[in-house]
Amino acid sequence: MNRRKFLTISSGVAIAKFPFHSTIVSHHALESGQASSPRTERRPVLVRAGFTRRASGSEEPTTSQQTVVRSLDSEGRLAVFVVPVGEHEPYRGAPLHVHHEQDEWIHIVAGEFVAEVGGKRFRLKPGDSLLMPMKIPHRWSIAGQPHCGAIHLYTPAGLMDISWDPSPNDNIRQTPEQRKAEFEKYGMTLLGIPLTREEIELTV
């Protein structure tokens, strides 16, 4: 599933669905040497505009989010995603969650986003960037302007590149228990809901 497809929970608040399916080497395996033995030859990874990189290493056209660096490209060091500049639904974003092993970084290319890290909120504008460290609860959302774009980076990569891939369960509404279990399976804990429209608009 595309990470920017959103579900609406019973409270009426839209949340980003994080899809996951385990086809990638874990960070623990990388640390233990399982993923780098034998060591593969490193090579440049070029992803053209309008294309996304799949787990197989192939590329395919996309009109939505792009995976441009996968865990296997960087020996697990990082994963990079692009929300291409275009029209996206405002007031949508990630629920409150915490990564146990990944730092998350966002750079704003166009439009505005609002992020909350450790209870402190930031309005991010073009050219701004924000590090959301591991083990600190955070959430982010597109602000009121539909025209926006951003770059997301996770280090180490963990399973985050899989979270951006399409999934057969994209359109299946999950129970809160299923959502929490999904987050835990991939090294995160789901803590709460996304930023509300009022919270976004009050952040300056």
What positions do the PLM features span?
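Short acidic-glycine-tyrosine-enriched beta hairpin
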Residues: 119-134
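Glycine- and acidic-residue-biased ligand/ion/polar-headgroup-sensing regions
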Residues: 101-113
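A short glycine-rich, His/Asp/Glu-containing loop-to-beta-strand
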Residues: 58-96, 102
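Double-stranded beta-helix
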Residues: 139, 143-204
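N-terminal export signals
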Residues: 2-27
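C-terminal segment of N-terminal export signals and the immediately downstream linker at the start
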Residues: 20-58, 204
